[in-house]
Amino acid sequence: MIQEESRVKVADNSGAKEVGIIRNLGGSVKKTSNIGDIVVCSIKKALPTGLVKEGQVVRAVVVRTKYGIKRKDGTHIKFDDNAVVILKEDGTPRATRVFGPVARELRDKGYLKIVSLAPEVL
């Protein structure tokens, strides 16, 4: 679970390395975001030649959390870090590659392009 003011890694090649969470979308009193949720972020660290620049405000989808999730079959899945993938205005990923594993729940939430770009789906 990721809350506001958290700093998380970026798991794509958009040029951003770290973002700060500004707002969790999906409700007026929503405190935390889990895998597959949309967040509003500010770019905190970025490469100078990347698609995004430091200080830019973007939307992103959460692809990994340390907190983990419980599946209906009773299994738990946790990752080593918190990570997001930056999105365009139409909801597709801005980058052309996704680094690291992503959760299978992204497929259920309609992020098929991110799942197809990822090297591993858990």
Swiss-Prot record:
Protein name per Swiss-Prot or TrEMBL: Large ribosomal subunit protein uL14
Family stated for the protein in its record: Belongs to the universal ribosomal protein uL14 family.
CDD domains from the UniProt entry: Ribosomal_uL14 (cd00337)
Purpose: Binds to 23S rRNA. Forms part of two intersubunit bridges in the 70S ribosome.
Pfam families tied to this protein: Ribosomal_L14 (PF00238)
Biological process per Gene Ontology, one example term: translation
Quaternary structure and partners: Part of the 50S ribosomal subunit. Forms a cluster with proteins L3 and L19. In the 70S ribosome, L14 and L19 interact and together make contacts with the 16S rRNA in bridges B5 and B8.
Record-linked HAMAP family: Ribosomal_uL14
InterPro entries, per database record: Ribosomal_uL14 (IPR000218), Ribosomal_uL14_bac-type (IPR005745), Ribosomal_uL14_CS (IPR019972), Ribosomal_uL14_sf (IPR036853)
Originating species: Mycoplasma mobile (strain ATCC 43663 / 163K / NCTC 11711)
GO cellular component: cytosolic large ribosomal subunit
Alphabetic keyword roster: Ribonucleoprotein, Ribosomal protein, RNA-binding, rRNA-binding
Gene: rplN
Molecular function per GO: large ribosomal subunit rRNA binding; structural constituent of ribosome
